[in-house]
Each structure stands twice: as structure tokens, then as C-alpha cells.
Amino acid sequence: MKYLLDTHVVLWTAENSPLLSEKAKSVILDENSEKYVSVVSAWEAAIKLGTRKLQLEGGLPEFFRMVDDNGFLTLPIEREYLRLIPHLPDYHKDPFDRLLIATAVTENMTIITTDQNVQRYKILWLW
């Protein structure tokens, strides 16, 4: 099964945070599951670093290390994802999350997230 990690899940995994659910940990530790991080999450992290809403000592390179060190695969932004965005219900206003949702729908992935707005869409999600 293919999983798409929301940005906070990448950060919590790297920190070994107690906020990470047991289900999420189980999937993340499962060597047979395909775990992806979208370039969208790196973009979101870069913006939050710039506005100081996110603190990473090593800046954006540290975020990329988190992705690499945990064996997550990187997913680019494809045109198909962008084509879907205008057709999504307007439950979620965050453009990063809307692109993650479009990615998950197009690629038939399960999103790992705590975001209840994401969970309102007719997609597979796990927490």
C-alpha cells in the first residue's frame, strides 16, 4: 500500500514525537509499505521556516535529511494533481493540503494526517 505523509507527520517521525499515533508509527516502521513525502511538504516547510512558524536548526536541508533518513520517497508535483484541485469540494482552504489531497486521489494513496479537514474528503486516510 502507498502512503502520503502530511508535513507534520514527517516532523513528528523525525522527532520521535509522542503525538504520532500508534497506527501511524506502525505504517511508518513497516518496511513493506511505500511511504511518500510530496515536494509540497518541503515547500510548506520552506515557507514556515521563512515566517518563523517552524524552527529547524539546519533549515530546509534538515527537512530533506528527515525525509532521507527515514527512507521516505519524494513525490514531485504532477499536472494531473493540479487539474483536480478546482474540482475538489471546498472543505479545506489550505493550498498545500488541497494539493496533497489531489495527489492522494490521483495516486490512490492513503494520507497519514491528524488534519480533520483532510479527513472530510472521500479519500483514504489514517491516523
Predicted region positions:
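Short, well-structured N-terminal submotif of metal-dependent ribonuclease cores
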Residues: M1-V37, T51-R65, E107, Q116, ...
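Active-site neighborhoods of divalent-metal-dependent phosphate/nucleic-acid chemistry enzymes
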Residues: E57-P61, D69-T114
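Generic structural signal for small/hydrophobic residues in well-ordered secondary structure
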Residues: T7-H8, A45, I85, A104
